[in-house]
UniProtKB/Swiss-Prot annotation:
Subunit details: Part of the 30S ribosomal subunit. Forms a tight heterodimer with protein bS6.
One Pfam family cited in the UniProt record for this chain: Ribosomal_S18
Gene3D superfamilies: Ribosomal protein S18 (4.10.640.10)
Protein name listed in UniProt: Small ribosomal subunit protein bS18
Phylogenetic classification of the source organism: Bacteria, Pseudomonadati, Pseudomonadota, Gammaproteobacteria, Oceanospirillales
GO biological-process terms attached to the record: translation
Domain of life of the organism encoding this protein: Bacteria
Purpose of the protein: Binds as a heterodimer with protein bS6 to the central domain of the 16S rRNA, where it helps stabilize the platform of the 30S subunit.
Keywords (A to Z) from UniProt: Ribonucleoprotein, Ribosomal protein, RNA-binding, rRNA-binding
Organism: Alcanivorax borkumensis (strain ATCC 700651 / DSM 11573 / NCIMB 13689 / SK2)
Recorded family membership: Belongs to the bacterial ribosomal protein bS18 family.
UniProt-recorded Gene Ontology molecular function terms: small ribosomal subunit rRNA binding; structural constituent of ribosome
Length: 76
């Protein structure tokens, strides 16, 4: 039987040399929220703790300014 190989997670922000995660960079932020609007945890994405904190505050700031939705699944 083939052995399951899990790809090593790496921090995208460290690899790209990002200093600060901007709340206006919606394409990056959308990659780190689920379709229901929840923030994806770092154990899934592999993001380092420093960038995960910046990411969470940037997502929350973008939500507050109505750039991102708080929840995305409205069935009405």
């Amino acid at each position: 039987m083939a052995r399951f190989y899990r790809r090593r997670k790496f921090c995208r922000f460290t690899a790209e040399g990002v200093e600060y995660i901007d709340y206006k960079d919606l394409d990056t932020l959308k990659a780190y929220i689920t379709e229901t609007g929840k923030i994806v945890p770092s154990r899934i994405t592999g993001t380092k703790a420093r960038y995960q904190r910046q990411l969470a505050s940037a997502i929350k700031q973008a939500r507050f300014l109505a750039l991102l939705p708080y929840s995305d699944s409205h069935d009405n």
